[in-house]
């Protein structure tokens, strides 16, 4: 297999990143359609983040095609009174998931956070991946977020 290259994202990559984000969304939330307007807003946010020093946006390329991305940041966490690193999204095309590329990108995100002065990292993990993260020895389960449809009537009453 030809080498996969990771690099900082550029503004021109943001449309492709948004398409990969939509793929990721469709995998993890097939029951909720991501609106085109939301994708357009995401492109705007990604373009802005490319030039911000506290934002982390990288892409993985194979044969000149973007096959994955990782998105994170560093910001002050008031409750903990410290600088924290965040990893919001990681997505790799299915045919490349066996390569440990996501793991390598996450490790790079952590190292970048350390260099920015962060002393703790937070990772948004999708429900299908939680079991793998819980087994990692260096990670503690910090918070769980649930979502519910506020429009649809539910037959289950609490």
Annotated model-derived regions:
Residues 4-19:
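A short beta-loop-alpha structural element at the N-terminal edge
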Residues 25-45:
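Conserved GNAT-fold acetyl-CoA-binding loop/helix
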Residues 124-128, 135, 140-154:
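Conserved catalytic-core motifs of GNAT/GCN5-like acyltransferases
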Residues 82-94, 144-147:
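Conserved acetyl-CoA binding element of GNAT-fold acetyltransferases
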Residues 59, 65-74, 86:
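Conserved beta-strand in the GNAT
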Residues 113-126:
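Conserved GNAT acetyl-CoA-binding A-motif
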Residues 89-92, 98-111:
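Conserved acetyl-CoA-binding loop-helix of GNAT-fold acetyltransferases
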Residues 47-59, 86:
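A short helix-loop-beta-strand connector motif used in the catalytic cores of GNAT acetyltransferases and
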């Amino acid at each position: 297999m030809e080498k996969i290259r990771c690099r900082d994202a550029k503004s021109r990559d943001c449309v492709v990143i948004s398409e990969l984000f939509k793929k990721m969304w469709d995998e993890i939330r097939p029951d909720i359609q991501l609106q085109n307007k939301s994708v357009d807003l995401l492109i705007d946010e990604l373009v802005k983040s490319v030039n911000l020093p506290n934002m982390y946006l990288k892409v993985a390329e194979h044969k000149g095609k973007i096959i994955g991305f990782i998105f994170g940041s560093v910001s002050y966490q008031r409750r903990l009174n410290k600088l924290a690193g965040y990893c919001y999204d990681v997505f790799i095309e299915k045919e490349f998931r066996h390569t440990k590329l996501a793991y390598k990108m996450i490790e790079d995100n952590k190292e970048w956070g350390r260099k920015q002065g962060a002393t703790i990292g937070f990772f948004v993990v999708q429900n299908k991946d939680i079991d793998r993260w819980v087994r990692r020895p260096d990670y503690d389960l910090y918070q769980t977020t649930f979502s519910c449809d506020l429009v649809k009537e539910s037959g289950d009453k609490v």
